Design a protein with these regions (language model features):
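ABC ATP-binding cassette signature C-motif
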Residues: 1-241
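Short cytosolic helices in intracellular loops of multi-pass membrane proteins
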Residues: 240-255
């Protein structure tokens, strides 16, 4: 169970996410989708029940805001890889040859010597020009800063990736590129989106947050619509049968 203030968002909800799933979280605005993300990030705690993540799982997420800074775009994206930054700092502060060799060995194992190329590839895919690579974060508009946050999240080594409306500030080319990137992503993906085509192209499971419950559907958005329509039709048939039965009982009682 989860509340925001006195408002219940989830009540006796159950959700199991399996390794490697690509799960789209859908539901009306205000239903609690972003709060569920905050729960997975440890920013909120459950009032009742348990939340379990595998030990050692690395969780990456797309921040919704970014402060203006003089840090250039490519460095901002690389900052998402904290392990790389730790190794880089170790190399810069090493005090002897053995220590330096050890840090360089870690850098090689981390594939850190190619990290700038990786960061630039992410930025190019999301629509940035080559001249943007050295442009300070403060030089970009709000929408482009959100793209920087997205690139930084993709740069972060992760087992679980959380993306909240990742296509909101993307044009079609960038959206299609992101779709391809996420299809190749090896970890577990949970994302929020109102873009049905994007959900269809990425998700293999849909979780519908509705009336404080979570309902899981296999497949993409098109499959979800079909399955949900079938379930609603079955529920209507059951309801109609119940009404007929109630009417029969009432008729019998009034005899």
């Amino acid at each position: 169970s989860l509340h925001r203030g006195i408002k219940p968002l989830l009540k006796h909800a159950d959700l199991r996410i399996h390794d490697g799933q690509k799960l789209a979280l859908i539901g009306p605005n205000g239903a609690g989708k972003s709060s569920l993300f905050a729960l997975l990030l440890g920013e909120l705690g459950v009032e009742e029940g348990d939340l379990y993540l595998p030990t050692g799982w690395r969780v990456a997420h797309m921040a919704q805001e970014v402060e203006a800074s003089d840090r250039c775009a490519v460095d901002y994206v690389i900052d998402g890889d904290k392990t790389y930054r730790e190794i880089e700092h170790g190399i810069e502060t090493a005090t002897c040859d053995n220590e330096l060799a050890n840090w360089h060995s870690k850098m090689d194992a981390h594939n850190g010597y190619n990290i700038k190329v990786q960061a630039e590839q992410l930025l190019h895919g999301l629509g940035f020009k080559q001249s943007d690579m050295v442009k300070p974060v403060s030089g970009f508009s709000g929408g482009w800063r959100i793209r920087l946050n997205l690139a930084q999240a993709l740069m972060t080594p992760s087992d679980l990736l959380l993306l909240d409306e990742p296509t909101n500030h993307l044009d079609l080319d960038a959206t299609l590129w992101l779709e391809q990137w996420l299809n190749k992503y090896q970890g577990t993906l949970v994302f929020i989106s109102h873009d049905r085509d994007f959900i269809d192209g990425v998700a293999d499971h849909i979780v519908h947050l509705h009336q404080q419950t979570l309902t899981s559907y296999p497949g993409n958005y098109s499959a979800y619509e079909r399955i949900r329509a079938e379930r609603l039709a079955q529920q209507q048939v059951m309801h109609d049968k119940q009404q007929v039965r109630i009417a029969e009982i009432e008729k019998f009682v009034t005899r």
